[in-house]
């Protein structure tokens, strides 16, 4: 969904990847993912598009909060400088060739003249294009990953090629510095056959299923244990399979409370525990699971007493920076065993699942503008309810769109940098899925 960092921004100054024998009707795809160290980072992967020798890896958002897959076409323009909808404004830049794809240079490409337009973050980002391309996508593994090849390639994947974007950002008259913008997005939300403009395609996951490259409409994401330093977090994404070594305890099914017209996976709000104090959120909302968002948003009604209770119960460890949560100390000083714990009710009566997210995983390099240098600004805010990349770093999220199943487990247990483990891999044939309680 790529939620805009409105509050935070104001403060900022396969072919198969394993050599394993499985029955012939079973197929799966493994994609390495990362949560880079950076204030606006989301869950991403590195992809080379096409077969041109001059192709460069491009860091693309893997977004459970949107449905469509796109990349920049060569010569694309990004416009900004106006706060008004569909007004390109006075400023623009050309997307560098190193982060664009030119199908004319790839012997494996096939293009079609199809128009596309995608809207993100409450109409603050609009991208447009008039070309689709089918080509080979090569996903680059982490150089420290174990039990995987260095790359995995999938042929004949369809993407929209975008040639322009409008960012609703005011400018100070200089058009400098240029804003950050997405280099590409692979939407991962469920495929819904409809004419809705929110789900117009191409659908990465549905196209893989339709081509029988995977036999089940499952997706599982995980992150490994965090490194000792504040840096990139590594993980993986499996389509059509699960790696049972990536979580502790059972996968617990939770209710997917998505409503008609919504895109993505929605769950009921959890209870939130910090410093031994459990709080029951008071905002009337459901919560979006959105790997394409840089932060988590806690469902405390901003004008109620609950935000103050949250900060007061932290024992002085957390401070309120205009709705953004800060740690009262340097980022490096955050204890490694200090967690935010989210307790979700299960789909089955009496079942619950607790997800521990290390507070250090929220420290992604955001800086206060004119604030206290002794405060570490976190990718964590109060109001609304979205669980973005930080939440994903502490959870295993498993979905089966065929059955409407959404399940959670405790993640962050496998070795930093590790890929999928062949010995713990379960690949799904037709009609199969993961175990859950």
Question: Can you describe what each PLM-predicted range is?
Answer:
Residues 1-25, 437:
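Fungal secretory targeting signals
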Residues 18-57, 118-131, 168, 245-283, ...:
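Pepsin-like aspartyl protease folds
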Residues 47-49, 55-63, 69-71, 186, ...:
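Short hydrophobic beta-strand that contains or immediately precedes a catalytic carboxylate
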Residues 18-39, 143, 147-280, 284:
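Aspartyl protease catalytic domain
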């Amino acid at each position: 969904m790529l939620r805009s960092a409105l509050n935070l921004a104001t403060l900022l100054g396969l072919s198969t990847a394993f050599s394993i024998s499985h029955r012939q009707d079973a197929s799966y795809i493994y994609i390495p993912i990362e949560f880079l160290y950076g204030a606006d980072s989301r869950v991403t992967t590195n992809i080379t598009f096409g077969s041109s020798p001059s192709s460069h890896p491009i860091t693309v958002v893997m977004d459970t909060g949107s449905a469509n897959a796109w990349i920049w076409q060569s010569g694309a323009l990004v416009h900004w400088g106006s706060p008004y909808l569909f007004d390109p404004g006075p400023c623009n830049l050309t997307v560098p060739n190193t982060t664009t794809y030119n199908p004319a240079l790839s012997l494996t490409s096939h293009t079609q003249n199809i128009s596309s337009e995608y809207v993100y973050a409450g109409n603050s980002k609009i991208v447009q294009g008039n070309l689709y391309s089918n080509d080979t996508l090569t996903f680059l593994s982490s150089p420290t990953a174990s039990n995987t090849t260095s790359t995995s390639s999938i042929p004949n994947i369809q993407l929209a090629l975008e040639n322009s974007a409008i960012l609703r950002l005011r400018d100070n008259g200089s058009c400098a510095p240029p804003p950050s913008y997405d280099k590409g997005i692979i939407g991962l939300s469920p495929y819904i056959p409809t004419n809705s403009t929110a789900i117009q395609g191409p659908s990465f996951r549905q196209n893989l299923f339709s081509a029988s490259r995977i036999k089940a409409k499952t997706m599982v994401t995980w992150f490994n244990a965090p490194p000792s330093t504040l840096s990139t977090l590594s993980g993986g994404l499996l389509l059509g399979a699960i790696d049972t070594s990536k979580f502790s305890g059972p996968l617990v099914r939770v209710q997917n409370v998505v409503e008609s017209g919504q895109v993505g996976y929605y769950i009921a709000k959890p209870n939130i525990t910090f410093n031994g104090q459990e709080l029951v959120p008071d905002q009337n909302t459901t919560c979006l699971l959105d790997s394409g968002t840089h932060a988590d948003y806690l469902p405390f009604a901003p004008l109620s007493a609950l935000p103050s209770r949250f900060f007061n119960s932290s024992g002085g460890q957390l401070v309120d920076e205009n709705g953004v949560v800060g740690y009262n100390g340097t980022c490096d000083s955050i204890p490694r065993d200090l967690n935010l714990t989210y307790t979700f009710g299960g789909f089955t009566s009496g079942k619950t699942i607790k997800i521990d997210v290390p507070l250090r995983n929220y420290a992604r390099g955001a800086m206060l503008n004119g604030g206290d240098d002794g405060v570490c600004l976190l990718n964590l805010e109060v109001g609304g309810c979205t669980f973005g990349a930080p939440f994903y770093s502490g959870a295993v999220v498993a979905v089966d769109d065929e059955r409407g199943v959404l399940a959670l487990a405790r993640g962050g247990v496998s070795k930093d940098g590790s890929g999928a483990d062949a010995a713990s891999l379960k690949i799904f044939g037709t009609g199969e899925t993961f175990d859950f309680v």
